[in-house]
Amino acid sequence: MSLLTEVETYVLSIIPSGPLKAEIAQRLENVFAGKNTDLEALMEWLKTRPILSPLTKGILGFVFTLTVPSERGLQRRRFVQNALNGNGDPNNMDKAIKLYKKLKRDVTFHGAKEVALGYSTGALASCMGLIYNRMGTVTTEVAFGLVCATCEQIADSQHRSYRQMATTTNPLIRHENRMVLACTTAKAMEQMAGSNEQAAEAMEIANQARQMVQAMRTVGTHPNSSTGLKDDLLENLQAYQKRMGVQMQRFK
């Protein structure tokens, strides 16, 4: 796996699924391929994206700044600086300085990542802030190692949260989660259907699913009533794909 592929993988792992994630993935691909050379426009676009947490925006801004060539006098962006200040905790800054001194002695991506994984997310963010604010300099490889270590820690905590959601025994949470997933699947079906002349069937199935969920939420139904809702939708989607000559079994 190449360095940039690894960085892209780690960064995308902390972004919630949805159309925005697909858009960010495309921007990252363009940046890493040298196709997007206007850093200021890129940062302005990032600043106004909804849903993303300030820290996620800070990490993306840091990655863009590392990768896109820019004029020396270009101002650092406040939204990135604020995100990478370790919540203003002096303890995080002290640890960030210690980590920075270690990273200065390292020259490899994997070495830097290994060292960085021993620190808290707050300290890692503060260390990125030091580098972003030009208070310290490391090689791009080392900076990317720091980015990936931070993303790994964030992804670990997100995964624990998802696992708790998936294994919860609370029937109301499970019921709502199934309905949310069904709506997300319906939206994906609509996007995949696109403008194809045979798309009306897929659009109708997706629309019916949305209406059913809306009715279930309005009336209030037994928590078991949503069981299998998403799977039914997926079966319909795969039957539609088969008729269209597309074989994809990756959604379950």
Swiss-Prot record:
Pfam families: Flu_M1, Flu_M1_C
Membrane topology: Peripheral membrane protein
Source taxon at top rank: Viruses
One GO cellular component, as annotated: virion membrane
Region of interest (Membrane-binding), ranges: 1-164
InterPro entries xref list: Flu_matrix_M1, Flu_matrix_M1_C, Flu_matrix_M1_N, Flu_matrix_M1_N_sub1, Flu_matrix_M1_N_sub2, INFV_M1
Subunit field text: Homodimer and homomultimer. Interacts with NEP. Binds ribonucleocapsid by both interacting with genomic RNA and NP protein. May interact with HA and NA. Cannot bind NP without genomic RNA.
Protein name: Matrix protein 1
Gene name of the record: M
